[in-house]
Structure formats: C-alpha cells, structure tokens
Amino acid sequence: MSAPDVTALLAELERSQPDLAEEARTAVEWLTGGEPLETVTQLDVCEFLWYTLPIKVGPLRPGGDHERLSRSLARLLQLGGMERYAALCVSPTTAQILRTYAQEGEDAGTSAYQKALEATGVLPPDVPELQWSMIMGPEELGAHVACSAALELAIVAGDDVDRSALTRRWLTEPRAELGGDSWLNRVHGERLNRWVLGRGPARRELAQPFEVRLYAPVTPQPLPALRKLLSLAASEGSLPLRLAPSPAALRLRELAERELGAISRDGARLAITVYGRHLLGSPEAMWEAVTRLLLARGEHEFEVSAREATLMLLADGVLMSPAQLRERVAEVVGGEGWHPATSLDDVTAPVADLVSQLTALGLAYSDDLVVRMDRPGQYAALAALRAHALRPRKYVSSG
C-alpha cells in the first residue's frame, strides 16, 4: 500500500465532505509540521489532540470547537487508511480531555492529558541510564520519538511490553540508522555540548576540556572515611555523640546525618538508617550518593555554579591557596551574568562549604594556606560534573 499523500487526501475530502476540508487541512498541518503523513506516530497524534489542539489551535469559524477539528482530522486519517489514529481523534478520551480544557482551564486539561498519555503505554519511561528532559534538543527528541515508536509497534503486535526494558534496549543498542552509534550516546553528547556552551566565555573556556573527559562513566572510588563512620554507627546499633572528633570528623558526621540521611540521632547517640545500611552495602551507591551531593547544595543556581567552577579548577589536582581559588571562581562565575558584578563575598560561602565537604570525605586536603584534591577527589569531581552535565533539562519555576 502506498503512503498516504496529504494533498490527495484533502482533495478527496473537498469532493466528499467540503464542510470538513478547511479544518482538516489546519489540523493535519499542525500534526505533521510539513513532514510526510506516514512519519506520524501515536505519540504525535495524542500530543496534538490532547495538548497542541486545545492550547495552540483556535476554532476556524464562529461557533466552531476543538472537537469539530478533531473529527475533521479523523475523517482525513480514515481516508488515508490510518484507522487507529482516526479512532483516537473521536475517542471518548479525546472528547473528555477537550471538554476539560474548555470547562476547567489549562491546568486541569494538561493534567488530564498527561494522565491519558501515560495510560497509552507509548510514552518512554525514565530509565536508570536516562531521565528524559522537559526541554529536548534534536538528538534527545529523536531518541524519544524512536523509543515511543518501538513501544507502539510492540503494543500493536500484541506483545507483553516491559516499557523500561524495551526503552533501555532501544537507547543502548547500536543502531544502523545512527552509523552504529546508540541513541544514549547521542543524547549524552548533546547534553555535554550544551553544558560546555553554558554561560559566559570564562566558564566555556574552563569547561571545554571536560567535554571529552566526561563522556565515559567515572570508575567509583573507595570512600574510607564515610565507610568507617557508617560502620561504627552500624556496630551495636549506634555511635556515641560524646566523642570529641576533629573539625573534619564533625563535618563528616553532619554530612552523613543532614545531607545524606545515612545516620540519625537517637538521644545521645547516632544510629545508622536504612538508607545508610544500603550505602554501606553498596560501594557504587555510596559513590553515586556522595558525588551527586557535591553539586546538589545551594538554594540558588548561582551557588551551584560556584561549586561547579570550584570542581573544574581543582579536578586536575592543582595546588591553590584558598584566596586564589575564590578569586578564580569569582572570575568564572562573574562572567555568567548572575550579578552586575560578582564579588569574592558572593562565592566565599559556597566554595568554603564545598571544600569542607571534600576535606571531610577525605577527597581533598585543605588548610589556611592550600587546597588540593588527591586522586580519589579528582575522580569524584569528574563524576559530580558528569552527573550535573548529563542531568535532564527542566522548566525553571518562577515561584
């Protein structure tokens, strides 16, 4: 069967049902974006009917409504032999969602759309290798569409679909259409490039060498200081608080309790938590939790940028004085446009907090004169930067 031609289908509709042709033309142009009709997927149809149509497309005539537009599109798709997609256009789900938008507003309609989309089974889920972004670049969008199409085909074939397993396979296996590359590699490359090209020329210059260095996963390293603390807390159930530890040990205890949630207070003692036992039993989980923590703190993205610059400056094991480190971080972050003039005062707190974290964890040496990361600390910096660079893009709340 030949692929349906939109122009021919519209001409046929003009002859058979001229009252629907104009609205069908508008609907199909929005649906396809000028691409051939055979490239459309179920996800495309659902997103058009349940989001684009009620949010962006207005009725073409007085008294018209979105349900009429969807019925017009259904007739066009029927003529093209796309019965499954035509049925979606006139389904009770579509009618209910469009009425929800009309009667209860955009927020309620969007909520109904998201619930219905999840129920279709064609929405690729987040998987351990990749959390999908709200704002996708071209490569990620291509990966998302490809995974959705694979899910759709499996469902239509009547397979018992494990969405996560199929999505992971589709993302990680080499694809002939990508020249042997995988969609996951493409998405990671796109995200790394976007991260490098972030704010300001000074930051771009600092980040550029990391684009290649962060491409491959970083080998987890042992964290003996944290492991010892958790082991003590786990032995006989708790760790006495009356011990007089060093400042670094106090900071480690605070980090384990307040930032990781690995230990908790029990009167005059500290006891290991369920999560702490999980970390103690999995060096990989402990490494991931600690490295993600290095760039997770900060009430404002500015503080995260200061910590990020600190890690990049220290990642090669260079020896710097605390004053030099603060000055360089201020130079890098100052060019990102956060403030009219970023001063040392602005970066002092986030830099000092990060250095104290690294020192407490045994990942860096610091005193009043020098700061330097040892080899495990350099690996930790790379792992933290990689996780940050590969994070999904989210809409920024103005609240």
Whereabouts are the PLM-identified features?
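Leucine-rich, amphipathic alpha-helical/linker segments
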Residues: N185-K228, A233, P283-G334, P392-G399
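Basic, alpha-helical nucleic-acid-binding regions used in initiation and control of genome expression
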Residues: G64, R68, G81-A150, I272
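N-terminal core-binding DNA-recognition domain of tyrosine recombinases/integrases
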Residues: A11-Q17, A24-A108
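Short amphipathic alpha-helical interaction segments
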Residues: G64-S72, A244-L260, A341-Y365
